[in-house]
Amino acid sequence: MFTAQKSLFLYAVSPIHRVCQAIGLIDNPIQREVHTNHPVFAGSGIKGAVRHRLYALLPKEDNRLNRYFGADSQGASDYAGAVSFSDAQLVLFPVRCTKAGYVYATSPLALARAKRLLQQSGLTTW
């Protein structure tokens, strides 16, 4: 069982397309929640991206990668990893603006969802 929680804010510096089913002519649609149709990034994909980046940074003989994320696919049933990622929610979205190039837009619903998730992880003020 996990004993500590941390909230992370992710910022995309390039366009993002999550892997999910192709729909018609669009072959890389954004993954969405079924019940709200809001964009979402699966925690498993975030964990895989973080693991991949650390794999490139850590020396090959360093065992921390397996301790943090679990064994690779050959030994996946040996033990679980020490970290877990939940799904990421979209809070701000870049929108083209005639006066400023781009601005970040949000909604009361997106802010309320973010506040609720942060409170669940123990953050009381923001």
What spans do the regions from the language model cover?
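RNA-binding basic/glycine-rich loop and surface signature characteristic of RAMP-family CRISPR effectors
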Residues: 1-126
